[in-house]
């Protein structure tokens, strides 16, 4: 009843009225929305991306978030047994579907991407294109719509296996690259929106031998990552 009255009132305002769809978007769409993608074998939800996801939510009251729904697996029975390659392919598709769908519903909402480990890899490919040849993913196109890319204001990747030292957005002590590192000369069209964190002792995003390093980026770089996001959101 109230919604019908509200709509009728708007229509009665004449040509100068704000379009109804625009009003409905303002009533239902947040100013900022965060997508989080978890690491391999993490339980459904945000996994270790939660540090930055929650930081953004706390810094911007009224902002919202959702987790990317994908296997996050590497063949382990605990995550359903999907191979890493299959999980990555499903993850890239899930990122594209979730972000593009949200953007079509809330085209004025600023978007933040936060991916940890495999979660960073799938977001990296979806946003930057270039494919993921080591995992058999040969589609090199950017998977997000141009409208969605425009509204992605910041992207944080932590422990991303596609890390390659020397790219403009790479941060940390790693001077090498991950097991799915980008090829020499790769250029991401959204490079200015990204910070990707990896340290030398990490065996997944770099060539180190300390697996514990891989789980420490939230505490090591969380504040720095949040500051970058804030600088991009304005």
Swiss-Prot record:
Keywords: Carbohydrate metabolism, Cellulose degradation, Cleavage on pair of basic residues, Disulfide bond, Glycoprotein, Hydrolase, Polysaccharide degradation, Secreted, Serine esterase, Signal. Induction: Induced by xylan and repressed by glucose. Expressed at neutral pH, but not under alkaline or acidic condtions. GO terms for biological process: cellulose catabolic process; xylan catabolic process. It comes from the Eukaryota. Disulfide bonds join 29-106, 73-79, 128-188, 174-206, 198-205. One of its GO terms (cellular component) is extracellular region. Optimum pH is 6. It is found in: Secreted. GO terms for molecular function: acetylxylan esterase activity. Its EC number is 3.1.1.72. Glycans are attached at residue 207. Pfam families: Cutinase. Pathway: Glycan degradation; xylan degradation. SMART domains: Cutinase. It catalyses: Deacetylation of xylans and xylo-oligosaccharides. Optimum temperature is 60 degrees Celsius. InterPro entries: AB_hydrolase_fold (IPR029058), Cutinase/axe (IPR000675). Residues 1-17 form the signal peptide. The active site is at 117, 202, 214. Monomer. Belongs to the cutinase family. Acetylxylan esterase subfamily. This is Acetylxylan esterase 2. It comes from Talaromyces purpureogenus (Soft rot fungus). The gene is axe-2.
